[in-house]
C-alpha cells in the first residue's frame, strides 16, 4: 500500500505572504483616526473653532477615502497615502503642538491651551501624527516600488 501524500497541516493551497506594508500602515492610521476622534468627542466638539471642526472633518473624509483606495488596491492609493499622511502629520502638529497661532489652533501648549486636554489627548495627537508620518513614508515606498518595476 502506498503512503499517503496528502498534507495534514491544514495549510493546503495557502501561500505564506508578507503583509503589505502600506495596508498595515493604513490600518494603524485608521486606528489613530479613531483614537484622536474619540478624544475630540470626550473633550466636546464645541471646544474647537468652526475652522478646526471643518478642516478636521475634511481630513477625516479624505483619510477614509485614502484607506479605502489602499485596501481596494487602487493605483492612486499610494499617492493619496503620501498626500494625506504627510498633510495630516503637519496639520495635527500645527494645530496641537504649537501655541495658539490662529483660528486653526487647538493648542495643547501655551497660555491659551485647549480645554480638557489630558494625557490621553497627548497620546491621541501623538499617535495620529506618528501614524500620518508612517502612512506618508509607506506611500512613498509604494510609489517608488511601483515605478522601479
Regions found by a protein language model. Name each.
Residues 68-97:
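Loop-to-transmembrane helix junctions at the membrane interface
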Residues 36-62:
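Transmembrane alpha-helix entry/boundary detector in multi-pass membrane proteins
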Residues 32-43, 86-103:
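C-terminal TM-helix exit segments that contain a strictly Trp-centered aromatic cap at the helix terminus
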Residues 58-64, 128-133:
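Core segments of transmembrane alpha-helices
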Residues 44-48, 94-121:
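Interfacial non-cytosolic loop connecting adjacent transmembrane helices
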Amino acid at each position: 500500500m502506498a503512503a499517503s501524500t496528502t498534507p495534514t497541516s491544514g495549510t493546503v493551497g495557502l501561500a505564506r505572504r508578507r503583509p503589505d506594508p502600506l495596508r498595515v500602515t493604513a490600518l494603524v492610521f485608521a486606528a489613530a483616526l479613531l483614537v484622536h476622534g474619540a478624544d475630540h468627542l470626550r473633550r466636546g466638539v464645541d471646544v474647537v473653532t468652526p475652522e478646526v471642526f471643518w478642516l478636521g472633518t475634511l481630513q477625516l473624509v479624505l483619510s477614509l477615502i485614502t484607506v479605502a483606495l489602499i485596501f481596494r488596491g487602487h493605483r492612486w492609493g499610494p499617492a493619496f497615502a503620501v498626500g494625506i499622511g504627510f498633510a495630516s502629520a503637519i496639520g495635527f502638529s500645527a494645530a496641537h503642538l504649537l501655541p495658539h497661532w490662529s483660528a486653526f489652533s487647538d493648542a495643547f501648549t501655551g497660555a491659551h491651551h485647549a480645554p480638557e486636554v489630558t494625557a490621553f489627548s497627548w497620546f491621541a495627537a501623538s499617535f495620529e501624527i506618528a501614524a500620518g508620518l508612517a502612512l506618508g513614508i509607506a506611500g512613498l515606498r509604494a510609489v517608488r516600488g511601483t515605478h522601479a518595476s
